[in-house]
């Protein structure tokens, strides 16, 4: 199960991919 787009975007920003 993938996290919501809103949260996923923030996580990607923090992780930096």
From Swiss-Prot:
One of its GO terms (biological process) is toxin biosynthetic process. Optimum pH is 7.0. Activity decreases sharply with increasing acidity or alkalinity. One of its GO terms (molecular function) is hydrolase activity, acting on ester bonds. It is an enzyme of class 3 (hydrolase). Its EC number is 3.-.-.-. Keywords: Glycoprotein, Hydrolase. The keyword Cell membrane does not apply. Homodimer. Hydrolysis of carbamoyl and sulfocarbamoyl esters of paralytic shellfish toxins. This is Carbamoylase-1.
């Amino acid at each position: 199960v993938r996290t919501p787009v809103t949260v996923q975007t923030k996580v990607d920003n923090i992780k930096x991919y």
